[in-house]
Amino acid sequence: MLVLDYLKAGLFVVAAAAALFAAAGTVAIPGFWAYLAIFAVVMIVSFAALDPDLLRERMRPGGEKPPLALRVFSLVLFAHWIVAGLDRGRFHWSDDVPGWLQGICLFTVAAGYALALWAMRVNRFFSSVIRIQTDRGQHVITSGPYAFVRHPGYTAGILIIAASGPALGSWLAAALVVIFSLPFLLYRTITEDRFLQVELAGYSDYAAQVRWRLVPGIW
């Protein structure tokens, strides 16, 4: 089973590379390689450092088709890779991102993934499906990044989304992924938080102690 999980993760990296380079029509774009290297390292670290049960939970289908919003999010993710490839490699619509900013955004993408891995490391119930994992004895997690915000995984997602387009050197890809993905993450945060306050024992008390959903001092 774990071997199959490795293959799924590897195929996702390959799909990202194919979308970028096929759209660009060239592999001679260093920024794309740096972006994919971060992606690959995240996958390797995930399997090396995280609980195998958590990885299986993350990849489970949830017994039904993924919610429409999640499917749209996945499509937007791939679409922004294709747009970045077309922009940088072929048409140069908006590929004037300064090198220094591209470097900062690559670092921000890496930081976002690091935050997500930290959240998954301390929270063995971290799931892509909104549900109470009674089969795994789910309880409230208050350590690590959960001591500062209630949904650090979505905070990480916002960092990655905000920085991904400029990291790839395309303002157009940045606009696409931010406009269509940020509302999804905010909606998902609100929906999940309401669900947990009703369904997960102790979560309401935790929410009273940790006031911020995504960004300390803001929201």
What is each PLM-predicted segment?
Residues 149-150:
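Conserved SAM-binding loop
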Residues 1-146, 155-219:
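Membrane-anchoring alpha-helices and their flanking helix-loop junctions
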